[in-house]
C-alpha cells in the first residue's frame, strides 16, 4: 500500500504518519509513505506528479524482489486522498511513468475533498493558483471510464471536508460503472477517522476492518 498523508497540500511529512504505517503493517501489509513537495515550494499539479513518481518507485522495487505481481493499493487521508483519487481516475499522471490506473488493485480514501472547488476558498486558492480549468483538480470531474475499485470512508461529523464530497464522488464513480463502497462513520470527524486506524483509538470505529476487508476482496486483481 502507498499511503499519502494530508495537510492541505501545505504541511506534513511521512514521519508524522508512522503510526499509520505501523498500524497497517500490523495488519499484514507492506506500507510505503512517501513525502511529496508542498506549497509554497510548488503548486498543483506538482504534488500529484510527485505521487506518481512514488508509485513508480514502488513498482520498480517490487520488481527487484522478483514478485512483480504483488498487488498495489493507494490510500490517503484528506489532501492525500485527493491525490490518490486523481491518480486513479486521471491516467495522464501515470503516462510518463509507463503506468496507469489499471496497475492499481484499489484505492482507499479517508475524508477526501473529491468534489470541492479549490479556487473558491482562500485557504487553498494559492495552492491551485494558475489553474485554467478548475475541474482539472477535481477527481469527481476527471472520471473518464472504469477505474480501480474504491473504498471511500468519511466521518459524518467532518467539519473540515464535508462528507458530501464522498457521497457525490461515489455516485459519479458508480454512474461510470466503477466499483465503489462508501462508509460514513457517525461518530467520527476529520481527524478522528485517521486516528482510528491505530491504537489506542482503533476501537472507536471499525475503520481497519473496512480497510482489511477491502484489500482482501481485491488483492487478487492480477495487477503487474
Task: Show where each model-derived region lies.
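The serine-hydrolase catalytic nucleophile loop
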Residues: 10-20, 164-165
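Acidic beta-to-alpha connecting loop that harbors the catalytic carboxylate
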Residues: 79, 113, 156-158, 187-189
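Primarily recognizes the serine-hydrolase "nucleophile elbow" in alpha/beta-hydrolase
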Residues: 53-122, 135
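Short amphipathic alpha-helix adjacent to the substrate-entry channel of hydrolases
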Residues: 15-33
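C-terminal catalytic histidine-bearing segment of alpha/beta-hydrolase fold enzymes
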Residues: 167, 175-224
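Conserved alpha/beta-hydrolase "acid-adjacent" motif
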Residues: 159-168
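Short beta-strand element of the alpha/beta-hydrolase
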Residues: 1-7
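Short beta-strand/loop motif that positions the catalytic acidic residue
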Residues: 146, 152-154, 158
